[in-house]
């Protein structure tokens, strides 16, 4: 037997109209408990659920009480009794428990206990019974065993005494004989008459909790009277249990209906919002479809432009090739011109050499003319003609020398110009070669551009196809969203009707709760 500690012997009280409800499986594991039971026990719902019910057992309750309870329940009958339960902190509270088996398809699947607050007198009787059982005394005192029998035979004894008094009054043997003969049948008839109605009641009492042990907790009566009184109390507890469960169910139903009503209103509001947002999505999808179509058109235009760019790139490659060829020809021409200028410079050098020879001859002629003039002067008149010729020759030699000097300057200038031309031609040749290299690089770049444009053209074609497909999908989505919007509107109407039904259900549950509350008092 489980011994839960500690205990404080401090009683917790609760309102008389409060009902404490629990259900267990066949092993006594708690499967349900209402809020009132949780509050008075001090345990949390998590601590109680799936825990053994003897978690709240108080050590002051004798094991015989629980043994009697389980024997009664396993026999398929309800059990009723005053029980002292322990709180989590060691306090206690008294209950008048009515425990019934729970059936499912004819088989017992668990037990249900509905507890109400007992009276102070019932608690005192239960404590007295606990003390007797705890002391090892019999549950039913000996006097309670023979006193009911005496009370049953009391009418027969009284009638016998009346017959005896009649005999004394007649003052004869015939009077005593007559009194004896009348007393026996009258007493037996009275006893049978008394037992006849009582037996019918006792047969009804057998269907309820009428055990003498339990009766001691609820009444001071003895024998059949105690059993009948206990049967009435049991029926009252059974009715209260039924009403309490109806009330508990009505409370749960009311709460569920209230939650369903709230959810229905929220669902209706959500569906209305969904419908509005679906319309916005439909509008957005329409705009997206139009935009997609426009994108498809723009992509097609881009594809056309890309194709033209590809053609222009091809043409640019052709022009680059022609430019490269022209520059190469120009480079060759510059090279040839440079060679000609170089030859001209060489010829100028040769002319310079000839001019130097002529200059030397002129100088020599001038010297000879000077010598001739000297000789003519010596000859006098005979050499005057020769002197004139010598002067002319000297003059011619001087002019030749001057011309030769001019030619020499011109040839030097021509050589400088030719050298500059050669340098310029060499620079032009280098630049032409660099230009050819740049044209080759441009041609390579144009090849890359042409390949990129080809890839862009291919991707643009794919994008155009995807845009067309996306446009078709957008139209399909638009149709689906329109269908969803229609269904959402229909569902919203149904949600409103559901909300209205939930309100009516809440009203009905509240009416049921009020009806049960009127009778469960």
Swiss-Prot record:
Membrane-spanning parts: 147-169, 174-193
Gene Ontology molecular function: transmembrane signaling receptor activity
Alphabetized SUPFAM superfamilies for the sequence: Methyl-accepting chemotaxis protein (MCP) signaling domain (SSF58104), PYP-like sensor domain (PAS domain) (SSF55785)
Sorted UniProt keywords: Cell inner membrane, Cell membrane, Chemotaxis, Membrane, Methylation, Receptor, Transducer, Transmembrane, Transmembrane helix
This protein's name: Methyl-accepting chemotaxis protein Aer
Organism the protein comes from: Pseudomonas aeruginosa (strain ATCC 15692 / DSM 22644 / CIP 104116 / JCM 14847 / LMG 12228 / 1C / PRS 101 / PAO1)
Family classification: Belongs to the methyl-accepting chemotaxis (MCP) protein family.
GO annotations of cellular component type: plasma membrane
Classification via Pfam families: MCPsignal (PF00015), PAS_3 (PF08447)
